[in-house]
Every structure is written in structure tokens, then in C-alpha cells.
Design a protein with these regions (language model features):
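Multi-pass alpha-helical transporter architecture, strongest
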Residues: 212-219, 416-445
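C-terminal ends and interior cores of transmembrane alpha-helices
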Residues: 102-121, 322-337
Length: 445
């Protein structure tokens, strides 16, 4: 019996395709909204928060403080899998995804209402920190469910990489929407953007969350999870069980993402502070280039996912690691010319090598875990990378540049991350084109 057969009535091919299509749309739209919520903060951090909430005579110190609060959201992200991974493996993917969408959206809208330092002093920064933690928890619980919602509806084993990559499009699309919203209101004259214009993109989250909820409420639970219910394979404490039974996979999943997380946040966050403060680039140039890059990246993600189905997850990922390690030096060399056209080209192209990794990793990580522990295990491993790589990357980059007055150390830092990721990919089992819907595939786990 296949996973679809776990439903009370056996679905026709037409019904199955309709459910698959709706699940992919729901997961992709949902992750786009959640990443918009999380990344609008990232974009505005480099443009506004250092000045508005951490006014310091030294712009580098102000930027470091702002990036410190930015990093707090990443430290909170592993809490999301502990909470929502537990319920995702116990009550299902659907209900959990509705909860994560609400949590992140409400916190994001609240950020747009926080007064600046001139009004409430240091409390503005404190409130931002609390809201950033809530954002991090919501986003941390989102990823695993979204990927599984799409991947676990696959009828064959030959296109799981492609299906699992669709929720990954949410990151570049969310970044694109965040940049577009900031760019749109960035045309405000004088200090209007700094005073109030930046708040509107955060408040728009309320509308986007409403759309996401409408889509997600109508989806069915995945056949793989439905089968776990039918076979009575639900764990009482899935988070504890996955740490006990598959700790190696959790650690490797976290280390695997270093090559994607570190350069990803250098390209999408650090570049705004580096470009405006040290290169004298206009905010609109950086935003326009980033928007172009996210559009290119959105198209590239499913291509990378499909490539992982064809040549294997591991091979695709290693190619991506090599691309990132080589491109980081070209990237900073082009930015260093201060020629607007070359700077635009560097930023726009920077998303391609990162999205190669992003498109392959969803299936590579998720397939490493047995179905009854998959939401918890994949989510914990995935989000641990946010603490050790993604969150610290802008902070480390700013510190390295301040200490050495050169971008070469930043490039070396990215190369080290890429090497670690290659080793992790080599050690993580590749389940390309193998049936991962059955518990027996994973032995005595």
C-alpha cells in the first residue's frame, strides 16, 4: 500500500493531483509570507535600525548593535522546531503551519509600531528584541512543515527534490517582496522614510497573513502523516526521540547549511550596510540589484531541485558549495570597483550559487529522517544552522571588515564554511529516488 492508500477512500489520480497542487501552492505562498515577515527586518536593519534605535557616534558600532538584535532572531529559531516540530509530528503538518504563520505575522506587524530611541529610549531596542524572538520561533517552526507538506504528497520517488524545492522559493520571493516594499516607500522625500515610511512594509504583513491563512485552511493532511496515524506510529515526544535516535543526522544537517547560510546573509543583509556606509552606494541601487537577484533566484531554486532528482542531492549540493567559495571573491571585487553597473551585477548574480544549495537541501535534509520524526529532526537540524552560520554572518562580516579593513577575511570565512558543508554532504546519506515514506527504510531508528 502506498501512502495515498492510507486515506479512508483511495484517491483518484485527479484528486491526488489536485491535492498535490494545492499543497505545493499553500506551502510556497506560506513560506513566502513568513520569509517576507522575517526578512523585511533584515533589510531594514541595515538601512534604519542602527540610526533609529541605536544612535551612536560611530556608525560601525551602531550597525553592530543593530545586527546583534538581528542575530537574536536566529538564536530563537531552533526553539520553533522544539515546539512546532513536536506538534507537527503528533497532530499533523497542517495545523502547525497555521500556528506558525499567525505567530510570525503578528510579531512582524508589531515591529512597525515600536517607537524609536528618541521617544522611549532603550526600550525601543528591547521591544524589538522581544518581537524578533517571536519572529524567530515562528519561522523556525515553519520550514519543516512547509517542505513536508509539498514533499510528502509526491506519488513517485523521482520528483521529490523538485517538489520539496518549491517551499524554498519562499525565501528569495519573500526577500524580493521585502526589498520591493522598502524600495517603494524609500522614494519618500527627506527623512520621511526614516521617520515613518519604513513602518508600512511591516504593517502590510497583516494583509499577507490573511491571504496565507485562507489558502492553508483548505489543504488536506499529507498522506505520509495520515499513514502514520493509521499505523499508530505517532511518537509521544518526537523531539526527544529524534535527538536520541538520529543525533548524527541532526548535526550533519546543521553543518551542511554553512555554505548556504553564511554567504546568503552576507549577500542579502551585510551588503546594505557595507554598500551604503563604506562604498557610498545609493540605497535604491542596492535594493534594485537585490530585487533582480531574488527574481533570478526564485526561478533557479526549482531548477536546482530538479537537478538534484537527476544527478543526486549530494552532487548538486557539492557543486553549489564550490560555486559559493569561488564567487565570494568575485563578488567583493566587483563591489570594490564602486562602478554602479558592476555592483548591480555582483549583487544580482550572488543569489544563483546560494539558490543552488537552497534548492537541493530541502529534500537532502528531510529525507535523512524517518517519517515519524521527520518534522522535528529536519527542522532542528535546519534551524541550528541559523545560530552557527546565518545569524552571525552579518555580524562576523562587519567585525572582520572593521578589524582588517579588507573583504578578503570575509571571503576566507565563506570558504571555510563551504569546506565544512562539503564534508557534511559527503557524510549525510543521499536518498535520491528511494522510497522514504516507509519506516522500514530507516531500519531500527
Amino acid at each position: 500500500m502506498d501512502a495515498i492508500g492510507a486515506y479512508p477512500h483511495r484517491m483518484s489520480d485527479t484528486e491526488r493531483r489536485a491535492c498535490l497542487r494545492r499543497a505545493v501552492i499553500a506551502s510556497t505562498v506560506g513560506t513566502t509570507i513568513e520569509w517576507y515577515d522575517f526578512l523585511i527586518y533584515s533589510v531594514v536593519t541595515g538601512l534604519v535600525f542602527g540610526t533609529l534605535y541605536f544612535p551612536d557616534a560611530d556608525p560601525v558600532v551602531g550597525a553592530l548593535k543593530a545586527f546583534g538584535v538581528f542575530f537574536v532572531g536566529f538564536t530563537a529559531r531552533p526553539i520553533g522546531p522544539v515546539i512546532f516540530g513536536h506538534y507537527g509530528d503528533r497532530i499533523g503538518r497542517k495545523a502547525t503551519l497555521i500556528a506558525t504563520l499567525l505567530m510570525t505575522g503578528i510579531a512582524t506587524a508589531a515591529v512597525g509600531m515600536v517607537p524609536g530611541y528618541d521617544t522611549i529610549g532603550i526600550w525601543g531596542g528591547i521591544i524589538l528584541t522581544v518581537l524578533r524572538v517571536i519572529q524567530g520561533i515562528g519561522v523556525g517552526g515553519e520550514w519543516g512543515g512547509s517542505v513536508l507538506l509539498a514533499m510528502e504528497w509526491a506519488r513517485t520517488n523521482k520528483n521529490r527534490g523538485f517538489l520539496a524545492s518549491w517551499p524554498q522559493i519562499g525565501a528569495p520571493l519573500g526577500t524580493c517582496l521585502a526589498n520591493i516594499s522598502v524600495l517603494g516607500f524609500g522614494w519618500l522625500s527627506g527623512d520621511q522614510f526614516l521617520n515613518w515610511g519604513w513602518r508600512i512594509p511591516f504593517l502590510l504583513s497583516i494583509v499577507m497573513v490573511g491571504i496565507g491563512l485562507w489558502i492553508r485552511v483548505g489543504i488536506l493532511e499529507t498522506p505520509v502523516f495520515q499513514r502514520l496515524i493509521t499505523d499508530k506510529k505517532i511518537e509521544r515526544a518526537p523531539t526527544l526521540e529524534v535527538l536520541k535516535r538520529q543525533p548524527r543526522q541532526v548535526i550533519l544537517a546543521a553543518l551542511l547549511r554553512l555554505a548556504e547560510q553564511s554567504p546568503g546573509y552576507i549577500f542579502s543583509v551585510f551588503v546594505f550596510t557595507y554598500g551604503t556606509t563604506f562604498l557610498g552606494a545609493s540605497r535604491n541601487l542596492l535594493l534594485s540589484a537585490s530585487i533582480t537577484g531574488t527574481i533570478l533566484g526564485s526561478f533557479w531554486v526549482p531548477i536546482a531541485g530538479a537537478l538534484s532528482d537527476r544527478i543526486g542531492r549530494r552532487q548538486t549540493y557539492i557543486i553549489g558549495c564550490a560555486s559559493v567559495a569561488a564567487f565570494i571573491f568575485v563578488y567583493f571585487a566587483l563591489l570594490g570597483t564602486k562602478v554602479p553597473g558592476l555592483m548591480f551585477l555582483a549583487i544580482a548574480l550572488s543569489f544563483i550559487p546560494v539558490m543552488t544549495l537552497y534548492g537541493a537541501e530541502a529534500a537532502l535534509i528531510s529525507e535523512a529522517f524517518t517519517p515519524r520524526l521527520r518534522y522535528s529532526g529536519a527542522s532542528i537540524g535546519y534551524q541550528l544552522a541559523s545560530i552557527i552560520a546565518g545569524g552571525p554572518a552579518p555580524f562576523i562580516s562587519a567585525w572582520l571588515f572593521a578589524a582588517y579593513h579588507s573583504t578578503v577575511p570575509i571571503g576566507i570565512y565563506v570558504v571555510i564554511c563551504a569546506v565544512i558543508s562539503v564534508v557534511s554532504a559527503a557524510l549525510l546519506t543521499d536518498y535520491t529516488n528511494k522510497d522514504t515514506s516507509l519506516e522500514v527504510r530507516y531500519g531500527n531508528v
